Amino acid sequence: MGNAESQNVDHEFYGEKHASLGRKHTSRSLRLSHKTRRTRHASSGKAIHRNSEVSTRSSSTPSIPQSLAENGLEPFSQEGALDDFGDPIWVDRVDMGLRPVSYTDSSVTPSVDGSIVLTAASVQSMPDSEESRLYGDDATYLAEGGRRQCPYTSNGPTFMETASFKKKRSKSADIWREDSLEFSLSDLSQEHLTSNEEILGSAEEKDCEEARGMETEASPRQLSTCQRANSLGDLYAQKNSGVKANGGPRNRFSSYCRNLVSDIPDLAKHKMPPAAAEETPPYSNYNTLPCRKSHCLSEGATNPQISLSKSMQGRRAKTTQDVNTGEGSEFADSGIEGATTDTDLLSRRSNATNSSYSPPTGRAFVGSDSGSSSTGDRARQGVYENFRRELEMSTTNSESLEEAGSAHSDEQSSGTLSSPGQSDILLTAAQGTVRKAGALAVKNFLVHKKNKKVESATRRKWKHYWVSLKGCTLFFYETDGRSGIDHNSVPKHAVWVENSIVQAVPEHPKKDFVFCLSNSLGDAFLFQTTSQTELENWITAIHSACAAAVARHHHKEDTLRLLKSEIKKLEQKIDMDEKMKKMGEMQLSSVTDSKKKKTILDQIFVWEQNLEQFQMDLFRFRCYLASLQGGELPNPKRLLAFASRPTKVAMGRLGIFSVSSFHALVAARTGEIGVRRRTQAMSRSASKRRSRFSSLWGLDTTSKKKQGRPTINQVFGEGTDAVKRSLEGIFDDTVPDGKREKEVVLPSVHQHNPDCDIWVHEYFTPSWFCLPNNQPALTVVRPGDTARDTLELICKTHQLDHSAHYLRLKFLMENRVQFYIPQPEEDIYELLYKEIEICPKVTQNIHIEKSDAAADNYGFLLSSVDEDGIRRLYVNSVKETGLASKKGLKAGDEILEINNRAAGTLNSSMLKDFLSQPSLGLLVRTYPEPEGGVELLENPPHRVDGPVDLGESPLAFLTSNPGHSLSSEQGSSAETAPEEGEGPDLESSDETDHSSKSTEQVAAFCRSLHEMSPSDSSPSPQDATSPQLATTRQLSDADKLRKVICELLETERTYVKDLNCLMERYLKPLQKETFLTQDELDVLFGNLTEMVEFQVEFLKTLEDGVRLVPDLEKLEKVDQFKKVLFSLGGSFLYYADRFKLYSAFCASHTKVPKVLVKAKTDTAFKAFLDAQNPRQQHSSTLESYLIKPIQRVLKYPLLLRELFALTDAESEEHYHLDVAIKTMNKVASHINEMQKIHEEFGAVFDQLIAEQTGEKKEVADLSMGDLLLHTSVIWLNPPASLGKWKKEPELAAFVFKTAVVLVYKDGSKQKKKLVGSHRLSIYEEWDPFRFRHMIPTEALQVRALPSADAEANAVCEIVHVKSESEGRPERVFHLCCSSPESRKDFLKSVHSILRDKHRRQLLKTESLPSAQQYVPFGGKRLCALKGARPAMSRAVSAPSKSLGRRRRRLARNRFTIDSDAISASSPEKEPQQPAGGGDTDRWVEEQFDLAQYEEQDDIKETDILSDDDEFCESLKGASVDRDLQEQLQAASISQRARGRRTLDSHASRMTQLKKQAALSGINGGLESASEEVIWVRREDFAPSRKLNTEI
């Protein structure tokens, strides 16, 4: 019994020299591992069905009996029968290559790449493969067992038509790929890819000498029965050309070959069969290129002796597929990094099939990972490269050895790697051309799990790797952080990035420069770079690589043009589906029948999913286009707005509402995800593998999914017609035309149909397995399939209990049959087995007793696993010295009973009790002991020689999920053992340090590795002028700065729009309804109206600041953004205090859920909420709107930090932005502090407001936005009515703008219950706040203490004045602050609110003016900063001194930046600015001189920050009053000098500055409305007297 060969040949072309044609297959996985691999040997076993395998690809494929008859043999005749079913040498008598070949119909899978797969040389035609080396001494298997014959020389001679060979394994069979990740045979012609032996050593070259003598044989000779044919030429050398396959001509193929020769002059010398009537176009389209029918190797072979050739041994093979082109050459991607010449296409041949040599040391590859492109008239010839190569193998005698070193195209560097093992193919792929390399921290983010679900990764650790982007694959290398990597480095992990989307994550709470990559497998990863520049470079590099792959799939050279056309097509599809969806919704409203409604709803759901897919692809293509053009990435909000409700629910479950999570969810449900499980070596039951198609073939079944498959009776009993009927139409009828068209246009929308994808070229070769009743059948083992996966799949199909069976592999080693029992988690795809056996387990009783010795323990570890709702106990490991090992307990045994109790009924505590007992009775289900004569292997052969780690999954970072396990050694302890693979987690054994080299240096170093190596190809001159040079352009700092500024403005506009929507959609309608009380409305919306007014004003400020530079889009240097950056930073500085409005809103937000829960019980409220959100979009819910202000105010520091990072560290705008960042961080800290205070004391404040008496409340509200100070003071004179105090109580003092609140909170525990003789026992209602008192501002006084040392003692006196109308006596509070500084701050805040009270009384107003129309550097908008300016003529005389003093005081208080300078001892004195002024004051003082420009007229806003010297001089020469000049001299601040400033006289100078501002208000009162006041940089007007200050 052998694994069926995956390659077959077709006998279409017969000349004097015959082509050796091969077939390529694909695999769908991307996994690297520590495991090494080798090709699997041909199977052995039971013979009766070994000649009866048939391909399921063609509706005209003949059966095995017919093939035998055509070859002159009787079906199942004595000659071909095997007398010993279990004979390990059964292949000696088999002449048929029973190798099902993938049939490719372009109409079935056009979305894959839209091209045909040409059948290349069979595996037997690949000489000198590692299998011959592995089984070289097997005389029984192969003729001349100890001898190896090579049919070629080192100089590259062609194949011998007749030669004796051992069975070989080609290198190409070890390469497998995903839809869009191709490895072509020509790619494998590199010296590293010739064959598996080439990497391992050059010992094979000596065998070539033996073959040189055979080359001179001119006439074909028959192959003996013990010899092996190595190509189609070998098989048919005995016959003349013109033999007609299947007894007749094949018109399609004949026409195809004729046209092929007409297109390729090199092939014109071949004689073609007569052309058929039908004609094909001179240049066949890839979607219409005819494909040969697949059938057994023996078809058309009329010589019975050839049929008995040893070359027909059936075995398992994996081959590569070149779907696009031989080299992928005529389809250049974006033109990055050069390509090869035109002539290189014609010269490349796959020396993997006709030459063998050892690669020179240090030889690497030169070429572009973006595709070795060829343009001009010959570009199209690459389509037929594979076929032409195979034809010329048997005719060309001048192949050069060096031609194997052809340029490495993107098909190689981006190809899906072949297996979990780190084979030579893997190593070669990892040595492809480097697009980008650098040190990155990596963490798992999202992982696609079972049932198409996306979940957060469980093992989420940041790990450091050296990451290299080669093609469309990210390789992760472990490095010491000092030396980087070289061409010998082996990647530890790999991540496939084709069709990925990369998004920056500036909102990451802990790390900067983070980006997220989500791929088409439904996984997402977080990466952290070292700088913003690196982050942008990685995004551009990955998107460019993906764009290259898109162009390659569509066979286009102009990537930009392709992307634009695809975007246009997608927009049309989106428009059409949206219209259809709307029509369906309209129809739904008019339909009453429930069945019809359900049908319409299902169709609407399909449209929604299609729209999501289209929108995702549209966004992805726009990202690629932006990266290629060096532009700005599209706004993700537009994409997220199209998420359907189920998707939003899923993202809500994840807690991540982003492009990455959206992309992962969409990808998880598309057809591409069928590959995903092949990327992980993890255990999972077959029932959970929804993306894996049923892989058992040739089985009797009536299930719907297998209707298209021939049954075993049809294959072996009913002959060819039955098979034809079974296969007819399965490729034509299962995929509708519309689906095909959609797939051609957009490959990523394609979803595979299990009914039609029966061994399409994307899947793998079946392997024989034997059931317990000796019934043989076939199954497909894919890369990543573990022993448990395969066992569960087979058992489920045959209605067997997988827990009662185990999987055993049969090997043939040195003429002896040996067996190997793999671990459940072991990847059996890597093993070179002959066949799989399903064997029943046995049950046995084990009784274990502990002795009195304390050292005795059971010595085994149990793992609890829930499988399909059934709890099972498995032995995870057994200690060799333990009692369990002595009794025969083995790892992997299933525990059925413990002490006569069923294991499934035991919980962890019961297990602990059992394990702690002195004796233990176990009923276990285990593997039987080996039978007599059965040999068990310890280290089975793998595909590549090397150490095999059976216990570790090859992608450790992709497999882990903590389960429950119990250690029997410690009866009371529980340990954790892996239960089932969970998801990607990039783990490494140790953390790597930061590399000493910069990432750019090392990326260049990686590229130099390939530039240093010789190559036969030279760069194409066309690439030197490639139109795609923009793809390599990275965003400059100016571009990034402009991008951040635009993001700030755009997001601010969106935010203001959302706030207005919240008011119009929810607040105003709710005020008219009765669902909620006024208090509940206050909790929900708080001071939302004030916030909206402020944000509208702030947005105008930002927009006007950006308008200072009219040609912002044209700026190319960072220093040209100086005006804009000063304006933006100044806006945040000026409005910093106004942002404290958010304190009240954020503080009350904690109560929002309690109010909204009312919707669950109040149907009217719920109906209102539903009516306001008719589409039920998560982004339009009330909860979503209410969280936006909190998110926005915390976003500002992040945006400022991005601006800050892009400016020159020595520039003044850099310093300016730094101050703005610190200010906004203080605002955020203030908001957080207010929220904590509200949570603790909010109830007290509400109670104090409610307890007020009188018709009009003195204090309307105690809002967190009005809280100026919170401190703790000692109450020196508590009243006796409050009881005795062991020590003076400590009060919490709150200074609001409208009142001072004093609260005493008792920290003691709740009192015990009170028991009285005259009443029942009750609990006293415990109130922790024993004292609370509110002093309104109208009744507040501060008195100076008579004690001279009061200031030193930090004591102050607060008075609540008496009220005769309310009958309230005067109350005095003697308070002691913690320090004199604390007392000073406290009194400062109190005096501040008292001054506000007096000002309100003076102006007869009830509140402070709210709007302050100000934008830094904004002309009239500065009026608010300098004081009110009525529209009056300046010609009017100056007001009186008393009015000036009053206006001065008013202007100073309107200065939003805190300008209150208070003398603690005398509140009546003019306040003085404290020396420790805030950052805002210092910035204003240092950057601006207000007074110099008070008298300037007719100055435009565009003159602000002008570099015009004449303008500056004109300002300098302006006349100023003497008094104003003196004030100016006192207030003028010299240019900031770093490190040499001092704080001397800071307070006095700031006082003068504010006086200056006040005077300007006086003079400005008479100014006309048309005049403007301008702020300019202080450095432009440096006065003669300079004062240095230090921040």
UniProtKB/Swiss-Prot annotation:
One GO MF term on file is: guanyl-nucleotide exchange factor activity
Q: Where is this region: Disordered?
A: 1-70, 305-380, 393-422, 933-1034, 1456-1481
Q: How does it sit in the membrane?
A: Peripheral membrane protein
Domain RBD, chain residue ranges per copy: 765-832
- All copies of domain PDZ, residue ranges: 845-908
Specify residue ranges for compositional bias: Acidic residues: 977-990
Which residues get modified to Phosphotyrosine?
Answer: 829, 1323
Encoding gene (name): Tiam1
Sites of the Glycyl lysine isopeptide (Lys-Gly) (interchain with G-Cter in ubiquitin) crosslink: 1404, 1420
**UniProtKB keywords:** Cell junction, Cell membrane, Guanine-nucleotide releasing factor, Isopeptide bond, Lipid-binding, Lipoprotein, Membrane, Myristate, Phosphoprotein, Repeat, Ubl conjugation
All copies of domain DH, residue ranges: 1040-1234
Question: Which residue ranges have biased composition labelled Basic residues?
Answer: 20-49
Does Repeat count among this protein's keywords? yes
Q: Which organism is it from?
A: Mus musculus
In which tissues does this protein get expressed? Highly expressed in brain and testis and at low or moderate levels in almost all other normal tissues. Found in virtually all analyzed tumor cell lines including B- and T-lymphomas, neuroblastomas, melanomas and carcinomas.
Tell me what this protein is called: Rho guanine nucleotide exchange factor TIAM1
